[in-house]
Structures are given as structure tokens and as C-alpha cells.
Regions:
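Conserved beta-strand hairpin/beta-sheet module of binuclear metal-dependent hydrolase folds
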Residues: 1-23, 137-149, 154
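Residue-level marker for buried hydrophobic side chains located in beta-strands
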Residues: 3-5, 34, 59, 145-147, ...
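Active-site metal-binding loops of divalent metal-dependent hydrolases
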Residues: 7-9, 38, 63-65, 130-132, ...
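Active-site HxH/HxHxD metal-binding segment of metal-dependent hydrolases
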Residues: 12-13, 21-109
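Histidine-centered catalytic micro-motifs
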Residues: 33-43, 127-135, 189-195
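Divalent-metal (often Zn2+) His-rich catalytic cores of metallo-beta-lactamase-fold enzymes
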Residues: 48, 52-55, 116, 139, ...
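Core dinuclear metal-dependent hydrolase active-site scaffold
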Residues: 110-140
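Short glycine-enriched, charge-decorated loop/helix-capping segments at active-site entrances
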Residues: 159-166
Length: 209
């Protein structure tokens, strides 16, 4: 079986299929999707994945972001009603359509801080709010890999903190990084910037100072 962490923008299903195939993983093996948070570029292709899969895929997310993913509440960062006329006018028509008609899908199971999923030799859920209220990061115990989501980014191969422009609560987001310090991490995967190898804990410690 296979699991997928986040689903990209709307319309990226074929890219997901191709990437899985290149990694030697059939799309037909996909049994679970874990969402790190509610942002459009993380939940975008979820409805397409669920529609195209022959499996009963389980969707996981934190309870704080669940109503936004399910469409009960508008996405916090792309709600047209919260944008100025100037901001709205500057958007391409395609983005206006997406903001007015965001993807939505049912969350089957909500995740809690410290919870462990049995996939991949054990995945520990780390509640890392700030970027969004229900942001989570995932620690794959067997491979000592941290999937940070948007809690951190990688720029020019260097691990950096959350991006202020897209983070709803920067103080909370920085505080959330402290959760990583007690973990034995060898590799960090960030949604923006990709993979970073951790050679010493100072790389993480410097981000919370």
C-alpha cells in the first residue's frame, strides 16, 4: 500500500500519478492521504484523487483545519470576502475561480499531537500551528525523516523558518519549531524547497532563537 502526504494544487493528479510511477509506486496502491494543512496548494488535487481512485482512501488532517478542508468554512488565506478590491483585481481569472470554488473533500479521521500512525514503520503526528491553526508535521521514525509541511522551508539548500507572508501567526509558528528539537532527525522534507540533510542539531536550534 501507499500513502500520500498533501496533494498539490488543483489539476495536478496526472503529475502525482507520474511521480508515483517514477518512484515505482502504482497509484492503485494509494490507501491514505495525510494533509499537513488547509492551504490550496496542499489540498488542491484531493477531490480528483478520491474521484479517480478505486480504493476507499482514508483522509487524515488535524481537527482545527478540518472544517476548511471540508468546505464548511472558507479557506483562511484565499477567502475572497477577506481580500481588498486591489488584491482581488490583481488575481488572474483562473485564481479568482479557484478562490471562489475551492476544492473540498471529507476528512475521515482527525489527528492529534503525539498520535502515531502505523504506516511506514510509524509516523508520529507533531502539532505545529502557526502557518495555519491546524498545521501538522510528520516524523517518520524508521527513516528519521521529518516532513515539515510549511512549518519550515528550504532555500538554496539551507533550512529556514516559516515564511512570514504566508504564515497566519508567526509567533506561534516559531514556537512550534521547538517541537522538533527532541527528535532524532536526519532528513527534513519541506513542501517548499524540498529535501535537506541535518548534519547537526544547530541547524534547527538556530531557527528558534
Amino acid at each position: 500500500m501507499a500513502i500520500l502526504i498533501d496533494t498539490g494544487m488543483p489539476g495536478q493528479l496526472e503529475q502525482i500519478r507520474l511521480t508515483m510511477s517514477e518512484a515505482g509506486v502504482s497509484f492503485d496502491k494509494l490507501k491514505a492521504v495525510i494533509l499537513t494543512h488547509q492551504d490550496l496548494d496542499h489540498i488542491g488535487s484531493l477531490p480528483e484523487i478520491l474521484n479517480q481512485s478505486n480504493n476507499n482512501i482514508e483522509v487524515y488532517a488535524h481537527a482545527h483545519d478540518k472544517p476548511y478542508i471540508e468546505g464548511t468554512l472558507p479557506l483562511l488565506k484565499t477567502d475572497p470576502n477577506k481580500m481588498s478590491k486591489e488584491q482581488w483585481a490583481a488575481l488572474p481569472e483562473q485564481m479568482k475561480f479557484l478562490y471562489k470554488n475551492p476544492p473540498k473533500a471529507k476528512v475521515d479521521q482527525t489527528l492529534e499531537d503525539g498520535q502515531e500512525l502505523s504506516y511506514c514503520g510509524g509516523i508520529q503526528i507533531i502539532f505545529t500551528p502557526g502557518h495555519t491553526p491546524g498545521h501538522i508535521s510528520l516524523y517518520l521514525k524508521q527513516s528519521k525523516t521529518l516532513v515539515a509541511g510549511d512549518a519550515m522551508v528550504v532555500a538554496d539548500g539551507v533550512l529556514q523558518g516559516p515564511v512570514p507572508q504566508t504564515t497566519l501567526d508567526m509567533t506561534t509558528a516559531i514556537h512550534s519549531l521547538e517541537r522538533f528539537l527532541d527528535l532524532d532527525i536526519e532528513t527534513v522534507i519541506c513542501y517548499h524547497g524540498g529535501l535537506c540533510t541535518i548534519t547537526e542539531k544547530k541547524q534547527l536550534e538556530n531557527l528558534v532563537k
